[in-house]
């Protein structure tokens, strides 16, 4: 295939994005938190640009895939809470703490590992506990036979140093 025929791109209308955010905000109400997912460079639309707009518009949180994406936002003036949905190596816990980034945790072992590293750093790591709601992908299992152990794991994760 001739590469000159493949000139595809996406143009983002920031006014339309702001309008869409406002429409969603009105629909969900002020008492519901809004998390904008900007992983993978906001799906190719420019994570810093989209994050700035969401921050200025009053969104509550941002979510990214990796620590690199989160730190890039911090280095570009994004101060709102950022959640990493993917895995972060324990060696990066000090960077998470330094940049005030929240890490998703999917199991007890990972929560304990992160807690141990945070204690070594002398800091506190913010975590978000993922709960598997039925897709059987990631998170604490809290249904059927796993309900009791899942709830216990979540409670334990909430009290780690």
Question: Each PLM stretch: what is its role?
Answer:
Residues 2-11, 32-161:
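Active-site-proximal beta-alpha core segment in soluble small-molecule metabolic enzymes
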Residues 5-29:
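Positively charged, low-complexity intrinsically disordered leader regions
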């Amino acid at each position: 295939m001739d590469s000159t025929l493949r000139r595809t791109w996406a143009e983002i209308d920031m006014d339309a994005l702001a309008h869409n955010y406002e429409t969603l905000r009105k629909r969900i109400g002020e008492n519901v938190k809004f998390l904008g997912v900007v992983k993978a460079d906001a799906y190719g639309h420019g994570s810093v640009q989209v994050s700035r707009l969401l921050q200025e518009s009053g969104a509550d949180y941002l979510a990214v895939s990796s620590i690199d994406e989160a730190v890039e936002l911090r280095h570009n003036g994004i101060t709102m809470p950022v959640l990493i949905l993917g895995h972060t190596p324990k060696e990066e816990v000090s960077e998470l703490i330094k940049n005030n980034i929240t890490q998703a945790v999917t199991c007890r072992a990972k929560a304990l590992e992160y807690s141990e590293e945070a204690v070594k750093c002398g800091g506190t790591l913010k975590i978000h506990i993922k709960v598997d709601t039925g897709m059987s992908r990631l998170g604490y299992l809290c249904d059927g036979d796993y309900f009791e152990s899942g709830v216990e794991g979540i409670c334990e994760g909430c009290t780690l140093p």
